[in-house]
Amino acid sequence: MANQKQTTHFGFKSVDWNEKEKKVAEVFHSVAKNYDRMNDLMSLGIHHLWKRYTIELSHVRPGQSVLDLAGGSGDLTRLLSQKVGNSGQVILADINAAMLHVGRDRLLDEGLFKNIRYVQGNAQCLPFADNSFHCITMGFGLRNVTDKDEALQSMYRVCKPGGKLMVLEFSTPVFPGLKPVYDWYSFNILPKIGKFVANDEASYQYLAESIRMHPDQETLKAMIERVGFEDCHYHNLSGGIVALHIAYKY
């Protein structure tokens, strides 16, 4: 699909199709060491609640195989590893080596290693066999993917029949009056926090822009259904600032 499209967006900028992946990699290489601290500051810690809610609705059971895609620093992987137990397995996959190392080191420091594997891989061409996973989670990663349709197709391929996809991502506020306040915070406060804490204003400017450019709830629902997933629905969290999409492969 990529060779059919000449340009895409990197935040608000139009870039060559093959350039976006490189630019996103540079962003996450830059933010990796401060990723957890910045998440806590930017969301006032609420991102932990969003992630716990995702795990609660996953209904993952002992012995199952789970893919935590764009798993980054390992928040979802940690919780999932507790659910699947020693008889199951969680694969933390991320395209970015720096983020993967942060997640691996963090989880190893917490003594979590028996049921976790780490794989560097691209969501658009996942290096796993067909029908491999009972559940696939992707937390705050889809908006950074160059070809979202191709990535969703790849997720569908590796999901087991009867399995579940869960996409947790920034979305479009639905409460009246919330969107302008959220936009003001995103474009005026987030980059300044990035500059102060991580000395990296540009990466957090991209974060704000990438959120604005990401498909809204209904558009993403249609994209997920288009690749073959069924019974797709979503939960608006914090007034739609974040949405959790859940869908099934039958």
From Swiss-Prot:
Q: Which residues bind S-adenosyl-L-methionine?
A: 73, 94, 122-123
What are the record keywords, sorted?
Menaquinone biosynthesis, Methyltransferase, S-adenosyl-L-methionine, Transferase, Ubiquinone biosynthesis
GO BP annotations listed:
aerobic respiration; menaquinone biosynthetic process; methylation
Q: Which domain of life is it from?
A: Bacteria
Query: InterPro entries from the xrefs?
Result: SAM-dependent_MTases_sf, UbiE/COQ5_MeTrFase, UbiE/COQ5_MeTrFase_CS
Give the EC number(s) under which this enzyme is classified. 2.1.1.163, 2.1.1.201
Keyword Membrane assigned to the entry: answer is no
Q: What Gene Ontology molecular-function terms does this entry list?
A: 2-methoxy-6-polyprenyl-1,4-benzoquinol methyltransferase activity; demethylmenaquinone methyltransferase activity
Family classification:
Belongs to the class I-like SAM-binding methyltransferase superfamily. MenG/UbiE family.
- Give a short account of what the protein does: Methyltransferase required for the conversion of demethylmenaquinol (DMKH2) to menaquinol (MKH2) and the conversion of 2-polyprenyl-6-methoxy-1,4-benzoquinol (DDMQH2) to 2-polyprenyl-3-methyl-6-methoxy-1,4-benzoquinol (DMQH2).
Query: Per its record, how is this protein called by name?
Result: Ubiquinone/menaquinone biosynthesis C-methyltransferase UbiE
Q: What is the species of this protein?
A: Legionella pneumophila (strain Corby)
Q: What is the lineage of its organism?
A: Bacteria, Pseudomonadati, Pseudomonadota, Gammaproteobacteria, Legionellales
Q: Which gene encodes it?
A: ubiE
